[in-house]
Each structure stands twice: as C-alpha cells, then as structure tokens.
Amino acid sequence: MKSILNDFLLMIQFFTRIPVNKNLQCEKVNFRRGAFFLPVVASIIGGIEFLVYLGLKNFLPPNVIIVLLLLFTAMITGGLHMDGLADTCDGFFSLRDKERIIEIMKDSRMGAFGTIAMIINLLLKYQLLYSLVLKDCSIAIILAPVIGRISILFLCLSKRTAKKNGSGNIFIGNMSKPIIFLITIIALAMNTYFLGLKITIISFIAVLIITYLFYLLCLNKINGLTGDTLGACNELGEITFLLILLMM
C-alpha cells in the first residue's frame, strides 16, 4: 500500500504543480508502476474542471468558462504538455539535422513555430470544448485529458530515445504492457458508459493512428523520442479525441 501511494504521489509531483512536499522514491521502477496513475491524475484534474464548469454555468456564459478552464489547466500542470508541443514544433519545423533539432528543442526560448503551435492548440481546444458544451457533451472536459495521457503511455512502449539524458527517458521504454492494457480497458469502459461503444471505438482508433503517425515523424526527425515529444503527443491526442466527438 505504501508503494502504491508513493507512485501515485510521484505522478502528481511530476506532472502537476500541486505541492506534494514529500520525499518520494524516484527509481525507474516507481515511474514504471506509477504510469498507471497518469490517466488517473488526468481524470482528477478533469473532474475538478468539470465541477468548476457545473458550478459556473448558471452564472457565466460557456465561452468564458472554457477560457477559465484552459487557464486552470495551464496553472495546475505548469503548461507542461503545451510547452512540449511548442518545443517540438520549434525543432521539427526548423528543417535542421537531428542534433540541431534537439538543441532547438532544449532551448528555453520559444520560437515562431512554437508560438504558432501553442496559439493554434489553445484556439482549437477552446472552440472544440465550447462546441461540445453546446452539444451537451461537457463530459469531454474529463475524458479528453485521460485519452491524451493514454496516448503518451502507448508512445512510451517504444524504446527509441533521441537523447542519452532527459526527463522523458524515465518513461520511454519503461512501460509495463499489462499496466497499459489495464488502464486502457478502464478508460474505454468509462468512455463507453458516457459516449457509447461506437464513438468510443472510433475515437480511440483515431487517437492510436495519430499517435503512431506522430511516432513515425519523431523517428524521421530525431530518430527517437524525448520528453517534449511526449507532451506534444498528449496535446495531439486530446485534440484528435475532441475532433472526433464533435464530428460524431
């Protein structure tokens, strides 16, 4: 039980700005086991946002609430995944060789492509969530972050790291297939309950396809994965999921 709590808190500490203030075991095995809790943490964040939406929907217009929810997400996660998307776009669209792309991705300064990617990402999320709320599909506020994190877990099944060192290396190739299978089944069951089997299957397949295509792009550009590409994958997974929901 103690190890389970350790791994759960480790995911909160690593992926959010929530102050855990606890000395935790941070070995690779802890991150391997803790991967189970990554979608769980996402569902908790999404659940809080959903409650905020329910609490405000009688007082504020939905478009204002969605902006506040996006702001809340950025604050509680530190913009971790969006930053990964921005860094990835800065590097990949620079049209340089592998070593230079990785150097650009490591640069803390945001370039033109990263800025454009972040703006488009936020605009898409805003419009998609706003449109889904108007369609009485506000449950997407909870489900999208979960699916995004699951896309990260599938990407991490690869052992291809683009750098010798990096925060992403503690996850890349350090995944347990039974854990991913279990958390995927739970997520699919939850989605089926709220969305129905047809939408669940189509949206999940679409996210897997986008994840795999993005993986091929990473291999082509930098011959592997980094922490930034994991964050980018999360954003792509969420956007894909929301797009499918709106189309259905």
Swiss-Prot record:
UniProt-recorded Gene Ontology molecular function terms: adenosylcobinamide-GDP ribazoletransferase activity; cobalamin 5'-phosphate synthase activity
Cofactors required: Mg(2+)
Major enzyme class: transferase
Subcellular locations according to the entry: Cell membrane
Major site of localization recorded for this protein: membrane
Any one GO CC term of the record: plasma membrane
Membrane topology field: Multi-pass membrane protein
Reaction(s) catalysed (UniProt annotation): alpha-ribazole + adenosylcob(III)inamide-GDP = adenosylcob(III)alamin + GMP + H(+); alpha-ribazole 5'-phosphate + adenosylcob(III)inamide-GDP = adenosylcob(III)alamin 5'-phosphate + GMP + H(+)
Keywords: Cell membrane, Cobalamin biosynthesis, Magnesium, Membrane, Transferase, Transmembrane, Transmembrane helix
EC number(s) per entry: 2.7.8.26
TM regions (residue ranges): 36-56, 59-79, 113-133, 137-157, 170-190, 199-219
Highest taxon listed in the record's lineage: Bacteria
One Pfam family hit: CobS
Biological process per Gene Ontology, one example term: cobalamin biosynthetic process
Pathway membership, UniProt: Cofactor biosynthesis; adenosylcobalamin biosynthesis; adenosylcobalamin from cob(II)yrinate a,c-diamide: step 7/7
Database matches in PANTHER family: ADENOSYLCOBINAMIDE-GDP RIBAZOLETRANSFERASE (PTHR34148:SF1)
Stored HAMAP family: CobS (MF_00719)
Family according to the record: Belongs to the CobS family.
Function: Joins adenosylcobinamide-GDP and alpha-ribazole to generate adenosylcobalamin (Ado-cobalamin). Also synthesizes adenosylcobalamin 5'-phosphate from adenosylcobinamide-GDP and alpha-ribazole 5'-phosphate.
Protein name as catalogued: Adenosylcobinamide-GDP ribazoletransferase
Encoding gene (name): cobS
